[in-house]
Structures are given as C-alpha cells and as structure tokens.
C-alpha cells in the first residue's frame, strides 16, 4: 500500500487476481510481488510480520490465478523463508543479500533463483560504474558461498536507490547527483553486466520525473517506455515494469528497427 506508484497497488483478492490476469494476458514472463516499499525517499518501513502477512496472502492468490513464476521482493530472511516454503521461484533482494545476515542461509537451504541489486551499507564516493561492478561482485561472492550458481542469478543496478539521503536502510548513500548516477548507469549497462543477465527497473521512476518535470508517477508512461527501450538496446535482458503491454510493444518495435 505504500508503493510510490499507486496504480501498482493491489490489496483485495479480486484486485490481485485482476492485476495478475491482466499482466499475463499482456505477456508478462513472471510476476514480482512486494509487501513493503523500499523507495528511499518514502517513510514506508513496516514490521516483518506485516510484510510477511501481505506476501503470504498475495502469493497464495497469485498461485491460484496463474502458473507464471513468482518473484518476491524482500530483503528479510524470515519473509523470504515463508515465500519459499510456498514454492516461490525467485527472491528479489534490493540489498543484494547484504541487509539481513540470515538471508544467505535461507537462500542456501531453498536454492531459489535470485535477483541481486547493487547495494552498499557504506557511502560510495568513487566512479559509479566501477563501484556498481564491485557491489555486484560482492553479492555474487555471497551467493557463491551458499552454492548458488551464476546460472540462477540476474543482476539489477538499482536505479533510483543511490541517493545522498533517504528515509530507510535500503538505499546506497552517494556524495554525487543521483540523477546523473542513474543516467550514467543506463548509458553504460553493458560495461557493468559482468557477462550476467541484467534486469533493469525504470518504470515511472523519479529520474524520469526529473527529466520531464512530472511529479506524479502516473504521468511518466511515455518517459518510461523511452527509457525501457533504450535499456534493452543498451544491453538489459529483463525489464521490470508496471506497463506490460505498452513496454512489450515498444521494445518489439524498437528491436525490429534497430
């Protein structure tokens, strides 16, 4: 309910069913579900119990609605454990397995596929491309230590999560302009991939609002589609989006032309 993009919120059973059916019909390859917003600029922290309840209830409904793989967006080990007990396929950790010390053990036990985001608990002051590569390498080392092969891992450069300041513990602090950081990363996706699949999430995000001077995320569709197309042309393998049909059509058209 705290998500920055209000149209993506589905609380009731019927709204979840409708949202999942719509995404599947529009061509989604998997469903990503979260129980707590981690947007750096919002005060959205909820208890582990609340996050877990939301995730468990949503996953059960989604599993009854579709056979698509399910990704759970959490950095809490206890929440991941409950989701994996239900048969969830993917854990999407915005902190790259670095926030909760118990997360690697849960990952080792259940052996899921992983989406690992670039993240540091310490401030990043150096070259953003090199630093992002290093953060990826550290997360890959953690995954390797619990016997998760690279073939089960996708990397995410955490667009929107590198900031000078924030209101939670899920972002990486930097001493430079966050919009410039995000644009630099998106311009140079191939240079940070480490020969790994790369997932990019730019849908309706703040940097688009900054570029277009559109404060309301719901007004950022055109900017989102442009950014998503460029991401794919620049080397992204997976796009996490709120707008499945529009995104697929834009990317399909761009790939044919390019």
Regions found by a protein language model. Name each.
Residues 3-22, 38-57, 61, 77, ...:
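Active-site-adjacent loop and "lid" segments of alpha/beta metabolic enzymes
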Residues 18-34:
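Catalytic domains of carbohydrate-active enzymes, especially glycoside hydrolases
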Residues 28-30, 74, 106:
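Active-site loop-to-helix "anion-binding N-cap" substructures in soluble metabolic enzymes
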Residues 66-67:
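His-Asp phosphorelay/catalytic-motif detector in bacterial-type signaling
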Residues 149-152:
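Short acidic capping loops at alpha-helix termini that bridge into adjacent secondary structure
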Residues 158:
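Acidic/histidine-rich, metal-coordinating catalytic segments
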């Amino acid at each position: 309910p705290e998500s920055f993009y209000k149209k993506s919120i589905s609380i009731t059973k019927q709204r979840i069913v409708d949202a999942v059916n719509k995404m599947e019909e529009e061509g989604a390859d998997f469903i990503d579900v979260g129980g707590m917003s981690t947007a750096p600029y919002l005060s959205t922290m909820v208890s582990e119990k609340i996050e877990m309840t939301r995730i468990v209830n949503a996953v059960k409904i989604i599993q009854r609605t579709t056979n698509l793989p399910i990704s759970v967006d959490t950095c809490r080990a206890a929440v991941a454990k409950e989701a994996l007990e239900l048969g969830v396929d993917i854990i999407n950790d915005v902190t790259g397995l670095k926030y909760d010390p118990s997360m690697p053990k849960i990952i080792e036990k259940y052996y899921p596929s992983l989406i690992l985001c670039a993240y540091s608990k310490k401030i990043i002051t150096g070259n953003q491309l090199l630093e992002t590569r290093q953060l990826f390498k550290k997360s890959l080392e953690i995954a390797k230590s619990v016997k998760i092969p690279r073939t089960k891992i996708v990397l995410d450069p955490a667009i929107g999560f590198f900031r000078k300041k924030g209101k939670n513990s899920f972002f990486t602090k930097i001493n430079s302009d966050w919009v410039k950081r995000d644009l630099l990363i998106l311009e140079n996706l191939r240079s940070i991939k480490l020969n790994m699949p790369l997932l990019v999430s730019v849908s309706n995000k703040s940097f688009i609002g900054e570029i277009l001077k559109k404060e309301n995320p719901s007004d950022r569709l055109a900017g989102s589609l442009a950014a998503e197309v460029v991401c794919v042309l620049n080397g992204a393998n997976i796009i996490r989006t709120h707008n499945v049909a529009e995104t697929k059509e834009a990317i399909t058209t761009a790939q044919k032309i390019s």
